[in-house]
Amino acid sequence: MPAIEVGRIAVVIAGRRAGQKVVVADIIDKNFVLVTGAGLNKVKRRRMNVKHLEPLPERVNIQRGASDEEIKAALEGAGISLE
C-alpha cells in the first residue's frame, strides 16, 4: 500500500484541522498533496504537507484532480464517512 496516493483517506495529525479525515485529491510534489473534505466536514480543498497526514487503509476510486462533487459521490457510493 503506497503511503500517499490519489483517493487515499487520511487523518490530519497536525495543525488546526488535526483529527479530521480528508481525501487526497492530487499529488503536487514529494512533500505536498491537495486534500479535501468534499463538503462532508469543515476541511476545505487545500495544499497540505504529507508529514501532517496519517494514511488510512481506506481508498476511493477517483481521478487525479477530481472535483469535490465527484469525490463526495465516490465516498457515498463506497459507504465511507469522513465524520
Curated annotation (Swiss-Prot):
The keyword Ribonucleoprotein applies. CDD domains: KOW_RPL14 (cd06088). Signal peptide: none annotated. One of its GO terms (biological process) is ribosomal large subunit biogenesis. GO terms for molecular function: RNA binding; structural constituent of ribosome. InterPro entries: Rib_uL2_dom2 (IPR014722), Ribosomal_eL14 (IPR039660), Ribosomal_eL14_arc (IPR023651), Ribosomal_eL14_KOW (IPR041985), Translation_prot_SH3-like_sf (IPR008991). GO terms for cellular component: cytosolic large ribosomal subunit. Keywords: Ribonucleoprotein, Ribosomal protein. PANTHER family: 60S RIBOSOMAL PROTEIN L14, LARGE RIBOSOMAL SUBUNIT PROTEIN EL14. HAMAP family: Ribosomal_eL14. Belongs to the eukaryotic ribosomal protein eL14 family. Part of the 50S ribosomal subunit. This is Large ribosomal subunit protein eL14. The gene is rpl14e.
